[in-house]
Amino acid sequence: MWPNITAAPFLLTGFPGLEAAHHWISIPFFAVYVCILLGNGMLLYLIKHDHSLHEPMYYFLTMLAGTDLMVTLTTMPTVMGILWVNHREISSVGCFLQAYFIHSLSVVESGSLLAMAYDCFIAIRNPLRYASILTNTRVIALGVGVFLRGFVSILPVILRLFSFSYCKSHVITRAFCLHQEIMRLACADITFNRLYPVILISLTIFLDCLIILFSYILILNTVIGIASGEERAKALNTCISHISCVLIFYVTVMGLTFIYRFGKNVPEVVHIIMSYIYFLFPPLMNPVIYSIKTKQIQYGIIRLLSKHRFSS
């Protein structure tokens, strides 16, 4: 089906020039890996088993935590394989699939944050109709739409990777596969693969960011009009966790995009560090932010710990 696909594996790299320190570098990476798994896993478990959290806001948070887990489980096994045992080889199919999931899940994460912004918008701008607007059916439809958009939109460029031949090199300057890294190694016309991602990012991630920004302008306008200071603070507190997660995700996305597109003279180590920050920082911080800033999550954790304490 894919006559031009190479049988040779790709070679991943960790931190070029720091190979001797890979075992030491693996310590903080493994610690972050475990924290991401525990933090997001705890959120998923808590929301599933605590019926007081069975609300649209927490369903969307489940989408975010699930996406963060999938991103981490997609990228970190190859990272740790290199740092621990210097396992650099990855099959071409495995590499393409890893790139597919990484990029798809980035679009899904942006869509999840957009859905959460919609939840905040309805909760503050139209609280009396909140339950009638965000029904379970609509929440499911939004969730399915977010995942379909992410996993379908990235398919065209990934499918083209299967038909390219790779005669330049098989070395990828990351510990995981990214579309832009694979694309550069192809001995073929990659014009479509250069242009499509720019259009896709503009119509998904950047457009999502603009819609979220506009929604918060309207939310702020509503909050300013609330007479009671206590009610104003309560309204703002409803969305403060989401605002923090939005800032972390989109600042890292824009930083990585800016460096990739315009940072030709930026040292390669900066590109590498930014890619790790992009894939690790949001999944690490999102559960921390929601655990600290959201009282319902805090109460849920306390109830969960108390339940296990008394049961033991």
Curated annotation (Swiss-Prot):
Glycans are attached at residue 4. The chain crosses the membrane at residues 24-44, 53-73, 98-118, 138-158, 195-215, 236-256, 272-292. Residues 1-23, 74-97, 159-194, 257-271 are extracellular. Keywords: Cell membrane, Disulfide bond, G-protein coupled receptor, Glycoprotein, Membrane, Olfaction, Receptor, Sensory transduction, Transducer, Transmembrane, Transmembrane helix, Ubl conjugation. GO terms for cellular component: plasma membrane. CDD domains: 7tmA_OR51-like. It holds the Pfam family 7tm_4. Residues 45-52, 119-137, 216-235, 293-312 are cytoplasmic. One of its GO terms (molecular function) is G protein-coupled receptor activity. It is found in: Cell membrane. Disulfide bonds join 95-187. Ubiquitinated by the CRL2(FEM1A) and CRL2(FEM1C) complexes, which recognize the -Lys-Xaa-Xaa-Arg C-degron at the C-terminus, leading to its degradation. It is a multi-pass membrane protein. Belongs to the G-protein coupled receptor 1 family. Odorant receptor. This is Olfactory receptor 51B2. It comes from Homo sapiens. The gene is OR51B2.
